[in-house]
Amino acid sequence: MSGADRADLPKSPPDFRILRGKTNEFMIRIYEATEPSDLLAEAFARLLPQLSERMTAPDREAVARIVASPATRQLVAAAEDGRIVGLLSVALYDVPSGRKAWIEDVVVDAATRGRGIGEALVREALALARREGVARVMLTSNATRRASHRLYERMGFVRYETDCFRRDL
């Protein structure tokens, strides 16, 4: 990673965690993206298609809007070299039934899966939701992502029956 790329990293002190994966240890840092950057835009472009073939990466202007939105938080997992290896979005909102959070777009780079990165991201999202006074956290996941579903269930998420509708505009 060049010096110019390193300048794109958050300025806060490094607080890396050691994750013990199935085959080795892996160091990551989880942080909230608060500024748009080329590094973040590249991560969206590289990782979102791994989540779904239908997803297209946001352009730099959209990344700026996403990061600036007061209703959403973007959590990032970075490897020791600064490379972003995982992303997660948390939407926070208030409705008459209480303050809630919705976790979406959880994706870990295929080359680094199985090392606890997804779990670390979700744990950080749950901690953020608690700090924000959230009473209930919802999470969406594609029906084909069975390994992810097992993780979410191990973490205390419960499947529930619902009819969810979507309409493209």
Which residues fall in each region the model found?
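Conserved N-terminal entry element of GNAT/NAT acetyltransferase domains
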Residues: 10-38
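Terminal substrate-recognition subdomain of acyl/acetyltransferases
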Residues: 22-23, 163-169
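Acetyl-CoA-dependent GNAT
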Residues: 28-99, 104, 122-124, 159-160, ...
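Hydrophobic adenine-recognition pocket in adenosine-nucleotide-binding enzymes
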Residues: 106-108, 141
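Conserved acetyl-CoA-binding loop-helix of GNAT-fold acetyltransferases
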Residues: 108, 114-127, 154
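Conserved active-site alpha-helix within GNAT-family acetyltransferase domains
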Residues: 119, 143-161, 167
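Conserved GNAT acetyl-CoA-binding A-motif
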Residues: 129-141
